[in-house]
């Protein structure tokens, strides 16, 4: 990690935004989409769900990390000069503000949903017929699967999994008048929302939590139910990686099991919960009052999209159909002829991701193809890409898959798919123990006459067919042999630790990506000093690295105009006189998740023009991407592709007024 030193004459917090607080600002922007009435109603509900899911994952990783730093006595300050304790305190306050907004959004959406005859009912609002139906549902569907547990010396407190929801009850035995607490963990196999009426005109729902509370006396017939508490927990879910583990797969299998029992870092309860029960449960999880988060009306907001069942087109975004790729149509879907003709780029999801799948399927079937090398960071369990690689191996081709088992929350799935590929005859490589292989690359080796020609697919996003429908990403297809030779070296580096002596086209983390960015920014500074056009356009998910931010500030002070599109975390403070007055930052949040990483440099000419330098990458500008991951930066040299990226993506992005 670069330890950039900032001006000692200025407060460090005025030069950098704290990473954790910036992330919370990002999630606030996601939450704002749930309030935006220009979005269809069900899409607003979905944004509320996404904001809740995002916050859970933030606590599972980032907030858990702060807890661990405090516990371990870690005294190093963050890049913006805060201790772990300072950061945690600020995160707590900001999160509670965010949850107030979430509560407001939920109540507003309930009103909007009711106008569409979609209701989330309280038990007190129901008639006898509804209650009879729910009692039957409870007896037939809920009761057989739940495990009510009395809490006393002979019944230990049950394990509640990460993101688990439960109900704590305080009861009094009718005969002995003895007070007793009991807990019911809500099974994940059951839906959060139970439908009362699913006609074409009216949808009514109640939560499973409320149903269990209503009929709890049927679980404990000899008791009076005095009070109940609905709650949800979030556990520390980070896996500490051992670089020297003898067997990486076995290590991760053990670590995944251990992660399931991580410490509780967030306790979510309904507002106005019973104080006695709240005190009891907070002691059980060793949570002080600051880390108890109150929500109104619904524990587990991420489940709210379950109610979006009504089939009414106006409630959702208009169906989106991606375009077919024109270049392939020109060549009658003959992939290798189309790619050999000249490079082309595909902009997902506006153009279909099927082209990537079809590329690998064509390679699997083509008798001239002798080998395929492929990175896999995230994909689906039934991925057509995995099927194509398996088929290729079964057809006698030499197939190598670099599967990243350190991909957070996909570790288990990736171990499983690697075993599936291995059974089909694919050679599996897990890459470096200390670096995640985050680059997106596919290399196809094809026998053409007396020579072997290489074809490559390089992307900014994962080989994930489902995410590709909602993530904006770029795919480059090329048979440029200089570029292909670099990709061959990339694979040899990952599979055999063969560090390349020279790369002709690409740049790689952790080898030279940091130097690449610093040199490109420095070149713009030099051009500005010579009176030449000096400008940078960049699009990424996150901008965190202090060294790169410092270089951007230096460029701004030299007169370089910098336009940044940063979807998520941004630690740079734009528009500050004498520091960043020439830097503009925007963040696009909308129907599609902005995921592509694009870096453009004026190179002495006004933007946009052919003389500008354009690169696409798998890397964001974060210390981990530059120093602790395997990433690729790819130059765009084909004139048509170069123009498409500058004009149709970057210029359009900066002109887009929605933020």
Model-derived regions: residue spans:
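Hydrophobic alpha/beta core scaffold segments
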Residues: 561-565
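N-terminal localization/anchoring segments of enzymes in phospholipid and broader phosphate metabolism
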Residues: 1-536, 554-558, 570-592, 598-659
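Glycine/threonine-rich ATP-lid/beta-loop region of ATP-binding domains
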Residues: 546-549, 553
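Cofactor-pocket helix-loop regions in the catalytic cores of large enzyme subunits
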Residues: 541
